Amino acid sequence: MSTKQKRFILPEDEIPRFWYNIQADMKNKPMPPLNPATKEPLKPEDLYPLFAKELCHQELDMENAWIEIPETVREYYKYWRSTPLVRAYGLEKALGTPAHIYFKNESVSPIGSHKLNSAIAQAYYCKEEGVSNVTTETGAGQWGAALSYAAKVFGLEAAVYQVKISYNQKPYRRSIMQTFGAQVTPSPSMSTRAGKDILTKTPNHQGSLGTAISEAIELARTTPNCKYTLGSVLSHVTLHQTVIGLEAEKQMEMAGEYPDIVIGCFGGGSNFGGICFPFMRHTIKEGRKTRFIAAEPSSCPKLTMGKFEYDYADEAGYTPLLPMYTLGHKFAPANIHAGGLRFHGAGVIVSQLLKDGLMEAMDVPQLETFECGCLFAQSEGIIPAPESCHAIAAAVREAKKCIETGEEKVILFNLSGHGLIDMASYDQYFAGILVNHELKEEEIEKSLGGINKI
């Protein structure tokens, strides 16, 4: 009888009581976001019209490494946390690798992804402030579904702008949001000035996260007692996601191992930061030798081909100016099925860490991600979301290197969500309809030309 342990699960009383704020430990702090009107460093009160006040302070906190998780939020975390750390014996066998592969299974949440970790927190802070309405954007619909559920939990009305290509590709995510009472609008739309401007110039525009953010911000500004919420990119969102890595840290101890490589797929940075930052703390403070890999789509390679500049997080220029690796806020990504990764820029924390060499980035073509996603499903029994397939592909690449070297490296990746509502994407892959989208240098240069140098 085998004594090998497959899953490592923490009891409820070991769910983290604090989020980890890596900004407090970074030797080189991120450059300050700028007020778009004055070009002066952003102050928390500059963000009050958009976000709940506590979130504004979390966003710019450079001093406190540990932020207490409100007890109400932690009680809701118990609905699905802790999430399992799983030893991927099946994948190891399929690859014939000596590497030890682990994944943190965030697909077990009620929504099927990691996004609920921040949605519950943001909705809680909005409710505490007396807010009645929240708006947001969503790509594939994972964040929109999470925010819709969290809003319902705290008695808030939710309005979601979903990127049009994903709105059409993933109708069941729309149904999930509507099940929780949210109003869902395809973006760009004619309901906002930002949307009208884009559709006037490009009537068949299929949308982008940057466009959907503009519309959600505009609606929040024009709706009484309303706040905007965001699913990635900003630092407070990444903060909430560190519950993933903090749990994984304890679970790796249970497994008797420590990762040589930690991997997360990359859209705006919250999923990557959530799994990586708690381990990166040991690299910064103790000199642990761990590689941290952000796996991004070849069609939206902001980390591997973008420039480090001050840029907006949205197409219309409503957000603060963020110091980040960007392809330009006017960038229109290809219509890949990993809708949650179709964002032009990276969060300020990740951008600074990449600039300082504390992490690395890897771009992965669409077809390779689906190939690896199918291999993972066949060997581990979980169909991964197209976004998560990027992390799997990066893990497979690293595990194959171990075949050549004979090293038993320990690889940890975050399975950010399941793909059971993304089967139309898999259908297109099996039918041979999907293709690889790769950007040319001249396309990137043209897109970057729209950035005003600060």
Predicted regions and their residues:
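Positively charged, low-complexity intrinsically disordered leader regions
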Residues: T3-V131
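Short glycine/serine/threonine-rich phosphate/pyrophosphate-binding segments
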Residues: L116-I120, T136-F154, N168-P171, F266-C276, ...
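A short, small-residue-rich loop immediately preceding and capping a beta-strand
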Residues: S118, C126-I165, Y258-F272, F292, ...
